[in-house]
Amino acid sequence: MNAPHMHDTAADGAAIEATVADIADTGRRALTRREQKEAYENNKLFKRIVRQVGQAIGDYNMIEQGDKVMVCLSGGKDSYAMLDVLLRLRERAPIDFDIVAVNLDQKQPGFPEHVLPEYLTQIGVPFHIENQDTYSIVKRLVPEGKTTCSLCSRLRRGILYRVAGELGATKIALGHHRDDILQTLLLNMFYGGKLKGMPPKLQSDDGKNVVIRPLAYVKETDLEKFAELREFPIIPCNLCGSQPNLKRAEMKALIRDWDKRFPGRVDNMFSALANVVPSHLMDTTQFPFASLRATGQADPQGDIAFDEEPCASGDDTAATRDGARPIAARPISIVQFDDL
């Protein structure tokens, strides 16, 4: 099934740029200097997010010719932004792919079930609402006052994998962003004893699906501003009554504090995920330390590698480009941005 071209969505995206650029209607007042600056910043934000999503898709070959991408839409800012940008990119991409939005209605009390169907119908996006009462299952199995997110996530994941097969989707798109990836890295380091993050592309647990995260390069603060600018009909994420994941909240606060007090630090952390040197870590499954012998030949990964450590210069910004994507990633994209 070929999804229709989203002319209304294109107009929505163009509306940002129109607002941003100028008021063409001569009958309306001119923008003040402050309004012009705000419009300029909004335009930069929109272009930056589109560019970063396109870059992530290109770097990891997330979307290919003929794909049917199942965009998982929760009603939160991240999934709305992901759908919005993917629709924009599809119009300009040199490949053809379909998009279908999917929401899992878990029957949480107070969930506004009309919001997403109305929104998706308005913008002309094919969608499927999957009704599954996982809320009752979670409430029955998890003690009162405990965090339900882990069990809820597992149940939701299994259902979405099944739905992807039923819809013929070749890719499952999730709305995790750069900060989610870094939070997961720190959680695994601090509480799991693992150097493990959240990959931008992976094979699903059942081996039948490919999961992609198109927002992998995008900062959460940018998504917050974008959602406010686009006025998405946000659905609260606390309807289930679950206690917040305090450890993840702690990591989120830590990252935001670092980003504010030490410019470049968080960008370098993110860049490090794409610049791994197994010979300088301690995992014997990733590097053959036991069989290592002197070869008599210079080794670029030997002691000389320590001569270029950036801590001597104090430069916290050299490892990234545009403050978002790792410079090690290949500079390719599924879309040209010259005229964005």
UniProtKB/Swiss-Prot annotation:
Residues bound to [4Fe-4S] cluster: 149, 152, 240
Look up the record and report any one GO term of the cellular component aspect. Answer: cytoplasm
What keywords is this UniProt entry annotated with? 4Fe-4S, ATP-binding, Cytoplasm, Iron, Iron-sulfur, Magnesium, Metal-binding, Nucleotide-binding, RNA-binding, Transferase, tRNA processing, tRNA-binding
**Motif PP-loop motif at which residues?**
74-79
Query: What Pfam families does the record point to?
Result: ATP_bind_3 (PF01171)
Gene Ontology molecular-function annotations: 4 iron, 4 sulfur cluster binding; ATP binding; magnesium ion binding; sulfurtransferase activity; tRNA binding
Q: What is its main location?
A: cytoplasm
* EC number(s) reported in the record: 2.8.1.-
Q: What does the cofactor field's note say?
A: Binds 1 [4Fe-4S] cluster per subunit. The cluster is chelated by three Cys residues, the fourth Fe has a free coordination site that may bind a sulfur atom transferred from the persulfide of IscS.
**Cofactor dependency:** Mg(2+); [4Fe-4S] cluster
* Pathway per the UniProt entry: tRNA modification
Q: Which GO terms describe its biological process?
A: tRNA thio-modification
Subcellular location, in the record's words? Cytoplasm
* InterPro entries referenced in this protein's UniProt entry, alphabetically: Rossmann-like_a/b/a_fold, TilS/TtcA_N, tRNA_Cyd_32_2_STrfase
What NCBIfam families would the database entry show? PRK10696.1
Annotated function: Catalyzes the ATP-dependent 2-thiolation of cytidine in position 32 of tRNA, to form 2-thiocytidine (s(2)C32). The sulfur atoms are provided by the cysteine/cysteine desulfurase (IscS) system.
Q: What else is known?
A: The thiolation reaction likely consists of two steps: a first activation step by ATP to form an adenylated intermediate of the target base of tRNA, and a second nucleophilic substitution step of the sulfur (S) atom supplied by the hydrosulfide attached to the Fe-S cluster.
**Family the entry assigns:** Belongs to the TtcA family.
Cited PANTHER family: AMINOTRAN_5 DOMAIN-CONTAINING PROTEIN (PTHR43686:SF1), SULFURTRANSFERASE-RELATED (PTHR43686)
> What's this protein's name?
tRNA-cytidine(32) 2-sulfurtransferase
The species this protein belongs to is Burkholderia ambifaria (strain MC40-6)
